[in-house]
Amino acid sequence: MINRNNRSVYFVWRFSEMKVWFAVSEAAPFAKTGGLADVAGSLPKALRKHGIDIRVVMPKYSQIPQQYINKMSFIGYTYVNLTWRREYYGIFTLEHEGVPFYFIDNERYFNRDWYYGQVDDGERFTFFCKSVLEVLPVIGFRPYIIHCNDWQTGLVSVLLDAHYRYYRNKGFYQYIHTVMTIHNLKYQGIFPKEMMDEIIGLGWEYFHPDGVEFYNCINFLKAGIAYSAKVTTVSRTYAEEIKTGFYGENLDGILRKRSRDLCGILNGIDYGENDPLTPNIYVPFSVNSIEDKQKNKVLLQKEAGLDVNPETPLIGIISRLVAQKGLDLIDRMIAELLEMDLQLIVLGAGEKRYEDMFLWAQGAFRGKMSANMRYDHVLAQRIYSGCDMFLMPSLFEPCGLGQLYAMRYGTVPIVRETGGLKDTVIPYNEYTGEGTGFTFANYNAHEMKDAVIRAMRVYKDKEKWRGIVTNCMQQDFSWERSAREYGNLYNQVCGITVTK
């Protein structure tokens, strides 16, 4: 240990000596509402392969499947102070695929109908953030890094500085640093300022424009951005975009201020869970047997109630049905698209107006449109493997996983150039044969339609199309590279020269 600029720093020379406490509000397969759960279920596995001692902590929701609850071991219990009130929390643990998971149990806060959207979410996740810190000496784990994710864990960094680093357990917390990952800047956890002393127990010296204050409210995500050692997002382009007014969701100012400590690390996908050679799809295939992909298409057309024709381009959409996903562009163009020689299959749920749009189209264009207003993991894999193209016209997309899954199964993405979509989809060049998809730059329905038309034109040339499908399947978006980047980031936070 040395002292650098009056700051004590532990040197961790190898990944194998690094210890990380990964705090998250959801993780697959225990609880999932979006891509955050996929990251939390996959990234720790990849980091442990590098020898990093990473452990995950999350709430013990009542919705966790019973098969996992039955395998959990009870460690013990203790209490958290929420100003004047003491709240019980139990500690359960379970090792899943080589990763230790710890679950914070409290019936008052986590036995609810759903994970989020409760009237007392601010209090619930204040409790969780305090538990993330309080539980460490109880389980005997002293990490170098606490890796926080999204607003639900945003208070950890400021609470660590305000109450724990120098004041608790005889220096136990003194050399712990925090990293904050923004998975989606739109969701920030904004609550009344009265929570400062009534629930959180923070002094008002933290309530200022460079701290937790946000238009006279408290902003949990901003707290994480302001007080963490490093801030990351899930793609390089998104890291640049959120420093602008258009994408910054009113936090662009503090993000520009923290720009030296802000970086983008692209998400990966679990190649074991998403493998076209597994029996989860109709007919397993690989980059060496692309012709078998056509068999998946025909069987998908039959299951989805579409006209069976292997020559008709089939476009898939798997998405939360919300405005962020560019569905208003599809709303403007869906009739024109379906009047073309193509088919469309949609899987997802969300806002009623978008569900109604797709259901209307299914009735108006029978045999050409299949609307499945739900989430179904098995059907999702069949769509990824059976479609020719995959449409993602997002208004903004921090990383996006759909296009990565699609390319894994040889389905060519059609995307808007934003966030992770821009970083992962290489525009197709008809002259060189390079590229992995079709893109458009502006948020415009006619540009989206033009990208679809360009894709359909190339689709008619079977040799060119096989080339672009091969390009897609040869891409590597596994977690290996991302895990090494995170490992290097952890070392940077601890003051270590980054390995190449």
Predicted regions: what they are:
Residues 4-7:
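N-terminal cationic leader/targeting segments used for protein routing and processing
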Residues 9-500:
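Catalytic cores of nucleotide-sugar-dependent glycosyltransferases that transfer UDP/GDP/TDP-activated
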